[in-house]
C-alpha cells in the first residue's frame, strides 16, 4: 500500500490548504474518471489495469517466452515513454547490473533514445556473435532516433539470419492501423503489438510498450498489473483521506503556489534511477507548458548528498523534495567487526546496512526540513512487482490531477515539436527548405 506522509511540509503551508485545494481536486478527478477534460481522449490509461486487452496480453507473454528461448539479447528500440518505463521497472526489480548477472533471461539493450554514433556502435558490437531479437517501439515509425536505429538493427538481423528469420525476430509495438512502422511490419510479417490511440507514450508503461521487454526480463507482469489495478481502485476514491494521489497532487500544487518551483525526487536505492528518469518525463511533459509547472529533478541518496546535498541544504529556497522509501531489503548485510578499528567504525559492527540507511534517511530528512526544504514522503512498503505496479499508477494518476490543477492539458507536448522542426530543416528534410535558409543564417553557416 502506497502511503503519502505530509507531516514534513505542514510548517511551510498556509493552513488549512486541504479545504482550498479539494474542490479543484474534485474537478480534476472527475475529468480523469470521465475523460471529459482537456486531452480527455488520452485518458485510456486511467482504467487500463482493469480493461486491458486480455488476448494481446497473452500474446505478450508468449512473445516474451519465445525471446527467452531463442535469444541471448533483446534490443529495445524506442525513445522517451517508449523505453523509460520498461528500463525503470527492469532496473528497479532486477538490478541496474541486470545484463551482468547470471540469469536465464536475455540481456536487454536500450537503443534509439539518442543520436550518438558511439552508443549505436557499442550496441551493435554487444550483439556480435549473439542470437538476438529486436523490439522496435514507435507509434508512427517516423520518430528520427528510433527509426534510424531500427534501420541499422534490421539490416544487421537480415544479414545474419536472412529476411525470413529476421522477420521472426522483430517485434513491432506501434499503431493498430496506420503509420510507417505498421506498414513495414505488415509488409514483412513482423509480429505487432499496439500502442493504444487513447494512451500517450509517457503513460504507456503498462501497455505492450513496457510489458513486452519487462516480461522478457522475467518479471511477473501479472503481479505488476494486479498492483496497478489495486491502486486504480484506491485512486477512484474522491477525497484526500483515502486517495494518496489526491494528497500528493494537492501538496505539490500548494507548494508550487508558495514559490517552490522545483521538485526533487529522491530515493536511497540505486536501482530506482531510471524510475526517476521515467517520473521526470511524466511530470515534465505533462505540467511544463503555458509558462507553468514544477521543474522535475532527481537525486540518488546517499551518493548525491556528497554533490547536490550542499545546494539542497543551503541553496535557494525554491525547491521541495519527494522521497520514495522502500521497506527492508531481502538481503540483510551486517557490518563486520574489525580488530584494528582503523576506520573507527566498530560502533557500526553487527548493524545491518538497512538500519544504517534508515538512520541516514531520517537524519537527512531532519536536516533538510530544518534547512527550509519541505519533504513529502512516499512509503511503498516493499520493492516487488505488485508494489511497483501500484507506484507507477499512483504517479500517473497524481500527474493527471496535477496537470488539471494547473489548468493545462496533461496529455500533450506541443513544445517538443520546436526542436524537431529545426532539426528536420537542418538535415534537409523535404518541405523544410524555407526554414532551413532562416536557420542557416542564424547559425552563421
PLM feature segments, named:
Residues 1-65, 339-347, 435-445:
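Extended, charge-enriched "interface" segments that sit outside catalytic cores
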Residues 59-72, 123-131, 252-261, 312-317:
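Glycine-rich phosphate/diphosphate-binding loops that line cofactor/substrate pockets in enzymes
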Residues 65-238, 425:
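Glycine-rich phosphate-binding loops that contact phosphosugars or nucleotide phosphates
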Residues 91-94, 124-127, 151-153, 186-188, ...:
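Short, solvent-exposed amphipathic alpha-helical segments in soluble enzyme
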Residues 138-143, 213-219, 271, 328-330, ...:
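A generic structural motif
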Residues 160-322, 327-330, 415-445:
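Active-site phosphate/pyrophosphate-binding segments
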Residues 297-384:
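Helicase-primase coupling helices
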Residues 376-378, 382-445:
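C-terminal helical/tail subdomains of lipid-metabolizing enzymes
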Amino acid at each position: 500500500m502506497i502511503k503519502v506522509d505530509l507531516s514534513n511540509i505542514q510548517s511551510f503551508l498556509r493552513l488549512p490548504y486541504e479545504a482550498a485545494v479539494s474542490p479543484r481536486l474534485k474537478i480534476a478527478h472527475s475529468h480523469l474518471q470521465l475523460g471529459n477534460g482537456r486531452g480527455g481522449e488520452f485518458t485510456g490509461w486511467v482504467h487500463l489495469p482493469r480493461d486491458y486487452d486480455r488476448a494481446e496480453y497473452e500474446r505478450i507473454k508468449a512473445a516474451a517466452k519465445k525471446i527467452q528461448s531463442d535469444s541471448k539479447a533483446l534490443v529495445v528500440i524506442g525513445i522517451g515513454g517508449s523505453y523509460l518505463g520498461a528500463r525503470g521497472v527492469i532496473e528497479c526489480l532486477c538490478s541496474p547490473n541486470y545484463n551482468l548477472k547470471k540469469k536465464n533471461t536475455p540481456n536487454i539493450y536500450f537503443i534509439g533514445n539518442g543520436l550518438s554514433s558511439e552508443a549505436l556502435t557499442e550496441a551493435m558490437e554487444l550483439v556480435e556473435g549473439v542470437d538476438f531479437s529486436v523490439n522496435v517501439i514507435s507509434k508512427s515509425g517516423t520518430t528520427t532516433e528510433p527509426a534510424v536505429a531500427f534501420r541499422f538493427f534490421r539490416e544487421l538481423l537480415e544479414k545474419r539470419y536472412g529476411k525470413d528469420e529476421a522477420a521472426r525476430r522483430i517485434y513491432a509495438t506501434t499503431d493498430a492501423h496506420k503509420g510507417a512502422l505498421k506498414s513495414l511490419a505488415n509488409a514483412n510479417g513482423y509480429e505487432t503489438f499496439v500502442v493504444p490511440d487513447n494512451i500517450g507514450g509517457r503513460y504507456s508503461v503498462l501497455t505492450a510498450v513496457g510489458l513486452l521487454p519487462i516480461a522478457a526480463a522475467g518479471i511477473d507482469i501479472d503481479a505488476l498489473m494486479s498492483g496497478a489495478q489495486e491502486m486504480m481502485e484506491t485512486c477512484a476514491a474522491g477525497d484526500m483521506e483515502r486517495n494518496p494521489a489526491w494528497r500528493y497532487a494537492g501538496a505539490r500544487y500548494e507548494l508550487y503556489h508558495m514559490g517552490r518551483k522545483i521538485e526533487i525526487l529522491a530515493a536511497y536505492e540505486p536501482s530506482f534511477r531510471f524510475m526517476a528518469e521515467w517520473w521526470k518525463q511524466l511530470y515534465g511533459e505533462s505540467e511544463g507548458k503555458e509558462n507553468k509547472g514544477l521543474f522535475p529533478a532527481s537525486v540518488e541518496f546517499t551518493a548525491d548528498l556528497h554533490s547536490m546535498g550542499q545546494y539542497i541544504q543551503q541553496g535557494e529556497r525554491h525547491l521541495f523534495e519527494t522521497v520514495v522509501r522502500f521497506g527492508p531489503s531481502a538481503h540483510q548485510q551486517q557490518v563486520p567487526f574489525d580488530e584494528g578499528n582503523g576506520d573507527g567504525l566498530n560502533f557500526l559492527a553487527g548493524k545491518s546496512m538497512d538500519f544504517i540507511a534508515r538512520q541516514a534517511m531520517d537524519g537527512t530528512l531532519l536536516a533538510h526540513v530544518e534547512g527550509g526544504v519541505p519533504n513529502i514522503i512516499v512509503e511503498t512498503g516493499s520493492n516487488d512487482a505488485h508494489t511497483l505496479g501500484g507506484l507507477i499508477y499512483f504517479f500517473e494518476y497524481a500527474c493527471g490531477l496535477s496537470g488539471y490543477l494547473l489548468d493545462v492539458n496533461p496529455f500533450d507536448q506541443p513544445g517538443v515539436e520546436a526542436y524537431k522542426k529545426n532539426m528536420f530543416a537542418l538535415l534537409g528534410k523535404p518541405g523544410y527548405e524555407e526554414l532551413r535558409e532562416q536557420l542557416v543564417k542564424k547559425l552563421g553557416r
